[in-house]
């Protein structure tokens, strides 16, 4: 199992956690969360964070470790997750990615480069000033000596892209053109088993609505009040998550509680739809319709057989 990587993905509320813990127990695995909200501390209810009890003694990584006042990039996630995969494999265990953030998953299993995530605002402003004073062609000429390929492929009037190319060179010391995927986007060093859980849409939406009701019963309002008291505001990355921004609107008197709950349910259903659209783009993803299996045990057996017999 040295280079195997199991992925259990799917839309919100489909039931990924229970299945993944069961698989981890049976396959000697450890779990790496691929959820862009569960990374944050103090945000347990609205992110539906897995509890210690639900973990069933299986180690879970990249959960509950980022301060919600801080920004956290996909590039940072990729670096931490890649290190953790190596660590798990070095101990003879199976790393299992579990979650619904498609970009996090792709950062690990696709040939992507996140140099473009880095920014140098000061240098950008300087380049904008140069372009305003001397024109786009002058700015474009600055590319010629450092990145001829980008100079030839980017039109001088595409100021935003020209600035991006110059900025990338300043940040990395490498030409912007060198960051293009040289091979297939689906090239990966791992032997992947990629499963996406799904179910009848009406059933999934019912589960989503019920989950939102349970969040309020568990104390979502109190959780967001505490975050607000800590100084968190709606312009922070963490507070833009579904469930948090709407409760902030309610606490600020912008909407009623009824509207708040309905907005979270609608937002979560729309998000589930977008998640499924994202997962369908990857030809390696094997969709598992939960309705066609009589039990979770059967789904677990199917995945284990696939891995053993491959």
Curated annotation (Swiss-Prot):
Family matches, as PANTHER family: TRNA DIMETHYLALLYLTRANSFERASE (PTHR11088:SF60)
Family annotation (Gene3D superfamilies): 1.10.20.140, P-loop containing nucleotide triphosphate hydrolases
Residue(s) at site: Interaction with substrate tRNA: 101, 124
Biological role: Catalyzes the transfer of a dimethylallyl group onto the adenine at position 37 in tRNAs that read codons beginning with uridine, leading to the formation of N6-(dimethylallyl)adenosine (i(6)A).
GO biological process: tRNA modification
EC number: 2.5.1.75
Chain spans, region Interaction with substrate tRNA: 35-38
Family: Belongs to the IPP transferase family.
Protein name: tRNA dimethylallyltransferase
Pfam annotation, one family: IPPT
């Amino acid at each position: 199992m040295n280079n195997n990587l199991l992925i259990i993905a799917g839309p919100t509320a489909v039931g990924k956690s229970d299945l993944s813990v069961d698989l981890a127990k049976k396959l000697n695995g450890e779990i790496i969360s691929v959820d862009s909200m569960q990374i944050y501390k103090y945000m347990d209810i609205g992110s539906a964070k897995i509890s210690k009890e639900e973990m069933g003694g299986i180690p879970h990584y990249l959960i509950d470790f980022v301060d919600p006042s801080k920004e956290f990039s996909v590039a940072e996630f990729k670096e931490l997750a890649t290190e953790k995969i190596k660590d798990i494999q070095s101990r003879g265990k199976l790393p299992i990615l579990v979650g619904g953030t498609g970009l996090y998953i792709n950062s690990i299993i696709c040939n992507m480069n996140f140099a473009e995530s880095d920014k140098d605002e000061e240098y950008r402003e300087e380049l904008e000033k140069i372009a305003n004073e001397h024109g786009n062609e002058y700015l474009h000429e600055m590319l010629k000596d450092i990145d001829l390929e980008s100079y030839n492929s980017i039109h001088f009037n595409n100021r935003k892209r020209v600035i991006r190319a110059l900025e990338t060179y300043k940040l990395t010391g490498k030409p912007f053109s060198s960051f293009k995927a040289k091979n297939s986007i689906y090239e990966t060093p791992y032997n992947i088993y990629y499963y996406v859980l799904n179910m009848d849409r009406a059933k999934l939406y019912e589960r989503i609505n019920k989950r939102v009701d349970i969040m309020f019963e568990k104390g979502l309002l109190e959780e967001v009040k505490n975050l607000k008291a800590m100084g968190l505001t709606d312009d922070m990355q963490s507070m833009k998550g579904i469930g948090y921004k709407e409760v902030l609107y309610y606490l600020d008197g912008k909407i009623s509680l009824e509207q708040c709950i309905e907005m979270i349910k609608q937002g979560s259903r729309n998000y589930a739809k977008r998640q499924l659209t994202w997962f369908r783009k990857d030809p390696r993803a094997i969709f598992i319709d939960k309705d066609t299996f009589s039990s979770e045990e059967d789904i677990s057996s199917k995945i284990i057989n696939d891995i053993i017999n491959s």
